[in-house]
């Protein structure tokens, strides 16, 4: 053992990386990692926003097919699909016609009832009820007018069969009914009946103040 020669290790002759290169490599790795993180951050929000929009969107209503109109097919009978489709179309058309008919029947009920206005029909030789609501008298005959049963008339007009407005005076209106003169005081309603009949004249009411009546008298 004492005679064994000592083996001397030779010094290492390998390449050693300088310190500044290590710093450069570290900076490159950090830069690549930072760019990769930014790239991933730009791409990843797209599916997240899409999923969030899908979650926030209201669910779409899907029309439910009634069991009575469902179309079924039998594997052993290929023609059953066509027959079932025809039955479904027939039932759908029948239900649509019933719905439209029911809506048409319900429509007249929703309309308000119209008030009966204008001239009523009287017996032959008699006049119906006349509501005298307005009387306009001026010195110009073409500007004189009266409102009977909600309609405006002038001298010479015939508001009812056989009745003619002959002249509009300041406090009365002169009519002719079937050729007979007939006088009605201003704003005096006619209760109906035959002109000149004492019963009809006795049923006349006293003039009452009406908010809608307008009486205008002008003189030059």
Curated annotation (Swiss-Prot):
One Pfam family linked to the record: T2SSB
UniProt keyword Transport, yes or no: yes
Region ranges (Disordered): 85-114, 188-220
Keywords, sorted A to Z: Cell inner membrane, Cell membrane, Membrane, Transmembrane, Transmembrane helix, Transport
GO biological process, one term: protein processing
Topology of this chain in the membrane: Single-pass membrane protein
Biased composition (Low complexity): 85-107
Positions with biased composition (Polar residues): 202-220
Subcellular location: Cell inner membrane
Segments traversing the membrane: 17-37
UniProt cross-references to InterPro entries, sorted A to Z: GspB_C (IPR032389)
One GO location term (cellular component): type II protein secretion system complex
Main location: membrane
Family: Belongs to the ExeB/OutB/PulB family.
Cited function: Out proteins are required for the translocation of pectate lyases and cellulases across the outer membrane.
Record-linked NCBIfam families: T2SS_GspB (NF037978)
Protein name, as recorded: General secretion pathway protein B
Gene source species: Dickeya dadantii (strain 3937) (Erwinia chrysanthemi (strain 3937))
